[in-house]
Amino acid sequence: MVAQAAPPAGTAGQGTHEAASAAHGAAAAHGAAEEGHGKKSHFPPFDATTFASQLLWLVLSFGLLYLLMSRVALPRIGRILEERHDRIADDLEEAAKHKAESEAAQASYEKALAEARAKANAIAGETRNRLAADSEANRKSLEAGLAVKLATAEQSIASTKTEALTHVRGIAVDATHAIVSTLIGSSPAQSDVEKAVDVALVKKDAA
């Protein structure tokens, strides 16, 4: 039999090393697969092994948020609130100013109204007094005129009455003289007849 030649020593050693590495990799993969099948899966936020990193990121996030709020958002909000407060204060001051002006105008109007009312009452009183004085003067003038007219009328009546009585006396004297002459058959004295008529007229006026 012809003997086969042996492979070189370096080639044989290299093949053996590669085979060992492949076997180790397969064993590691098999072990990892078995370990993965043997352990339970967890929700990442609830995984206790990641708590430290989660707390770190939480602190960093809140720190950045606080820095952003304190440097950007809060100053803006503060300025807005301050501007709003100043605007409200200005509006309140303006409203108070308008209120004071309105109250002053109302007081001035009421004062002017009271003065006008007092002046109107004074004018009305003066007018009433003047009309009363004029009416009194007219009344007195009318009464004086009526008194004069009444006196004139009384004088006229008295004169007419006197004249009428004179005629009546003459008629009475003539009638009495005729009656007495007829009764006694003689003519009485004229003076006696006139005296008798005058006595009769006086008694009549007294009655």
From Swiss-Prot:
Which residue ranges traverse the bilayer? Answer: 48-70
Subunit structure of this entry? F-type ATPases have 2 components, F(1) - the catalytic core - and F(0) - the membrane proton channel. F(1) has five subunits: alpha(3), beta(3), gamma(1), delta(1), epsilon(1). F(0) has three main subunits: a(1), b(2) and c(10-14). The alpha and beta chains form an alternating ring which encloses part of the gamma chain. F(1) is attached to F(0) by a central stalk formed by the gamma and epsilon chains, while a peripheral stalk is formed by the delta and b chains.
Q: Name one GO molecular function term.
A: proton-transporting ATP synthase activity, rotational mechanism
Q: What is this protein called?
A: ATP synthase subunit b 2
Q: Where is the composition biased (Low complexity)?
A: 1-31
Q: Which compartments does it reside in?
A: Cell inner membrane
- Would you identify the family this protein belongs to, as annotated? Belongs to the ATPase B chain family.
Q: What is the lineage of its organism?
A: Bacteria, Pseudomonadati, Pseudomonadota, Alphaproteobacteria, Hyphomicrobiales
Top-rank taxon of the source lineage equals Bacteria
